[in-house]
């Protein structure tokens, strides 16, 4: 699907490191008109409360403009953090890129 953008994130999604980058990228993507957004978390090895906050803010931003954010391949430690914060029922998580993209149909 040509109307889905996949954002590859890597490293640490923590306060002062990846959280601000994610915010900037999401603002740019939404300003460009993208509404179907997949955040690829495969290479994110650490996510703290700031990172979780930015993922949630990304989800809210997309929804505000009629879009959606879905998560792809979170590492086990990141998935555990999402589960502990009870965000997994709210956010759709996929292990397969094609499934994530097709879920927007």
Predicted regions and their residues:
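Short beta-strand/loop segment at the start of cytosolic alpha/beta domains
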Residues: 1-8
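Acidic phosphotransfer microenvironment of two-component signaling modules
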Residues: 76, 98-99
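Residues at the C-termini of beta-strands that transition into short coil/loop
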Residues: 10, 97
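A short, charged, amphipathic alpha-helix used as a generic interaction element across diverse proteins
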Residues: 103-105
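Amphipathic alpha-helical interaction surfaces in cytosolic regulatory modules
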Residues: 13-91
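Short acidic-hydrophobic, aromatic-tinged amphipathic segments that line or gate anion-handling sites
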Residues: 92-96
């Amino acid at each position: 699907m040509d109307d889905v953008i996949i954002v590859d994130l890597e490293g640490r999604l923590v306060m002062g490191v990846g959280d601000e980058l994610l915010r900037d990228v999401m603002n740019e993507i939404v300003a460009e008109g993208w509404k179907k957004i997949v955040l690829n978390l495969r290479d994110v090895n650490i996510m703290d409360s700031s990172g979780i906050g930015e993922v949630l803010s990304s989800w809210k931003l997309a929804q505000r403009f009629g879009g959606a954010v879905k998560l792809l391949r979170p590492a086990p430690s990141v998935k555990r953090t999402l589960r502990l914060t009870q965000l997994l029922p709210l956010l759709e998580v996929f292990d397969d890129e094609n499934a994530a993209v097709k879920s927007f149909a």
